[in-house]
């Protein structure tokens, strides 16, 4: 599609944002005519959305959100089919409930009736998929809809030291809509948490590469150093910087598109 967006620096990132918005529309049951895209003008977005839907239907495909949408529509249109599935699943357990969206929840509510034997597990402080339509407020309003429920709060944290947990709690406490909870770290105190801010990703990679190089010069083996990333895309700038500083490293990432991998990009740059 030839558009004014052909000169976008990172087309993959642009397409990922479009994909998230399509998922959000379906998960929230929004009509595309009433949706305003944050990635591109409405007319362009609708053209992309309609083209995507046309291709999916033409090839008899279903994406994940379609499976939820069609299930929801089927249950609403065919009470007899819904009744059959209600009898089959008398007890329902849902994990990561903080990431549920509106349509998924509406489908589950229908499926759980009339006994409403729902067991949900989640952490409202861990909801990070709002950009995909996740609605943590559903978990917060759950007790109002199911008044006879029993709530169990598990406060033991077996992953983090108390220093990490204390820093995280101090930050998340500013969220206005959350369940208040007391957490206890089971891994001891640990080292202090240091927070640093950088103007650009390049400046961040430069600073971290220098810190790692300094640690190695002081005798720290490289295999005792680790960097954690939220997405694989964030690793690319670090890999280039580590090679510049002759820092040995191993990347544990899943390759979805080989041509987006930094190794392939280096090869292509020579072609």
PLM features per residue range, with description:
Residues 10, 26-30, 115-116, 171-181:
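Proline-centered turn/helix-capping motifs that create local helix->coil transitions or kinks
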Residues 147-150, 155-248:
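Helicase P-loop NTPase motor core
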Residues 37-141, 156-160:
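Conserved helicase NTPase motor core
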Residues 243-247, 255-271:
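Conserved short internal alpha-helix adjacent to the catalytic or cofactor-binding core
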Residues 1-20, 196:
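Conserved P-loop NTPase-based nucleic-acid remodeling module centered on helicase motor cores
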Residues 14-28, 163-171:
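Structured, non-catalytic alpha/beta "coupling" segments that mediate domain-domain communication
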Residues 124-125, 253-257:
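Short, acidic/turn-prone active-site loops that include or flank metal/cofactor-
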């Amino acid at each position: 599609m030839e558009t004014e967006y052909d000169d976008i620096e990172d087309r993959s990132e642009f397409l990922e944002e479009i994909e998230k918005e399509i998922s959000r529309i379906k998960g929230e049951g929004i009509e595309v005519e009433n949706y305003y895209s944050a990635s591109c003008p409405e007319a362009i977005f609708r053209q992309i959305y309609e083209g995507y839907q046309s291709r999916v239907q033409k090839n008899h495909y279903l994406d994940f959100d379609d499976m939820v949408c069609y299930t929801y529509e089927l249950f609403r249109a065919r009470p007899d089919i819904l009744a059959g599935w209600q009898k089959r699943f008398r007890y329902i357990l849902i994990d990561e409930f903080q990431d549920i969206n509106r349509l998924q929840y509406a489908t589950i509510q229908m499926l759980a009736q009339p006994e409403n034997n729902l067991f949900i597990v989640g952490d409202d402080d861990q909801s990070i998929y709002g950009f995909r339509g996740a609605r943590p407020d559903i978990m917060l309003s759950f007790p109002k809809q199911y008044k006879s429920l029993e709530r169990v709060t598990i406060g033991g944290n077996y992953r983090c030291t108390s220093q990490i947990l204390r820093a995280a709690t101090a930050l998340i406490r500013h969220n206005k809509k959350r369940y208040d909870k007391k957490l206890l770290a089971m891994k001891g105190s640990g080292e202090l948490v240091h927070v640093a801010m950088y103007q650009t990703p390049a400046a961040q990679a430069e600073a971290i590469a220098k810190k790692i190089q300094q640690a190695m010069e002081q005798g720290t083996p490289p295999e005792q150093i680790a960097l954690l990333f939220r997405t694989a895309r964030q690793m690319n700038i670090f890999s280039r910087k580590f090679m510049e500083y002759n820092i040995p490293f191993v990347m544990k990432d899943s390759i979805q598109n080989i041509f987006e991998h930094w190794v392939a990009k280096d090869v292509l740059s020579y072609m």
